């Protein structure tokens, strides 16, 4: 489906130069984000989390919203778009159960444009995606209309080379960029390392549009998963759109609040207890500037701290 013949490959190697005015005046189609704002058209996204933090559940739910043209955690799809979900970790029965849970909370709707490539369903698995064989295998599975490819996950799909070496990542990066030029957005699902960052070479971050990190939080309800989502890279969107979120999942149903709202409540309580902003900063591990910003927001919103008076310490 995506392969080019040798003649066109030779033509593509010739440089194509544009003048500034020519590019500015070029009539390009309007942008159609797959999920606004973090899952762009013709982009690359990295989603990483430690084991048990819900990264596959999250990726599947986001992909389902793309396929149906719906929404997920307040992020809206522009229109329905085809999806190829490539899973190289889960046994086929577990994959089936997760998809059943996903569709059960969506009136059992199974969109025809949501395609699955399961390693467990292949005779010889899925070839490593740093090889021509692996690239060709996945490209042959991409059907017309597919605009989102989900690779879940990098550790099981990328098996050659050294994870921490930038050079080992280069062939895969070149392939992802080639898919991008052909109108395919890729969501790469990966594991977090001990530090909380994505595991392996930082070169993976160079060309991606968005990096999302899911962190599992303590929950009093064993049937409820509580996650903090952070955008550590957010090309093209800022401010409130890039704010951290506190996400909960229970029985396949997702809900969320902005993490800043929870932080405000914590800061408010500390202020009530008479703590100074510098003390709160040290206690929470946030910068003084961030704590000051939250205090200013509460002051503007006329949040009462001490009786009817808003408490602001005298520290500069």
Indicate residue ranges for each PLM-predicted region.
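The Walker A/P-loop phosphate-binding site
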Residues: 9-103, 108-109, 202
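Hydrophobic anchor at the start of a short beta-strand
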Residues: 83, 186, 291
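Surface-exposed alpha-helical segments enriched in charged/polar residues
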Residues: 64, 68, 100, 139-140, ...
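C-terminal regions of RecA-like/P-loop NTPase motor modules
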Residues: 4-9, 143, 181, 220-316
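Conserved, well-folded catalytic cores of nucleic-acid-processing
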Residues: 66-69, 102-105, 157-160, 179, ...
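Conserved inter-motif catalytic segment of the P-loop NTP-binding fold
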Residues: 35, 51, 78-162, 257-261
């Amino acid at each position: 489906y995506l392969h080019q013949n040798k003649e066109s490959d030779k033509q593509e190697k010739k440089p194509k130069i544009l003048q500034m005015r020519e590019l500015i005046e070029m009539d390009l189609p309007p942008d159609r984000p797959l999920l606004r704002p973090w899952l762009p058209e013709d982009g690359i996204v990295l989603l990483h989390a430690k084991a048990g933090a819900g990264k596959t559940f999250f990726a599947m739910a986001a992909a389902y919203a793309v396929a149906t043209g719906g929404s997920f955690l307040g992020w809206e799809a522009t229109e329905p778009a085809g999806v190829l979900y490539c899973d190289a970790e889960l046994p086929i029965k577990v994959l089936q159960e997760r998809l059943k849970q996903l569709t059960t909370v969506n009136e059992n709707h199974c969109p025809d444009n949501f395609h699955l490539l399961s390693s467990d369903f292949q005779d010889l698995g899925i070839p490593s995606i740093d090889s021509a064989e692996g690239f060709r295998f996945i490209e042959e599975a991409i059907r017309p209309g597919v605009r989102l490819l989900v690779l879940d996950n990098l550790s099981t799909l990328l098996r050659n080379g050294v994870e921490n070496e930038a050079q080992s990542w280069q062939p895969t990066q070149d392939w992802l960029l080639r898919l991008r030029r052909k109108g395919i957005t890729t969501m790469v699902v990966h594991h977090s390392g001990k530090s909380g960052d994505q595991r392996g070479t930082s070169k993976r971050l160079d060309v991606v549009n968005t990096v999302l990190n899911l962190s599992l939080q303590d929950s009093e309800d064993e049937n409820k998963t509580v996650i903090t989502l952070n955008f550590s890279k957010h090309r093209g969107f800022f401010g409130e759109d890039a704010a951290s979120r506190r996400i909960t999942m229970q029985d396949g149903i997702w809900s969320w609040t902005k993490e800043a709202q929870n932080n405000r409540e914590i800061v408010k309580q500390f202020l009530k207890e008479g703590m100074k902003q510098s003390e709160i900063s040290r206690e929470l591990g946030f910068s003084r500037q961030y704590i000051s910003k939250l205090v200013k927001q509460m002051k503007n919103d006329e949040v009462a701290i001490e009786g009817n008076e808003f408490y602001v310490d005298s520290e500069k």
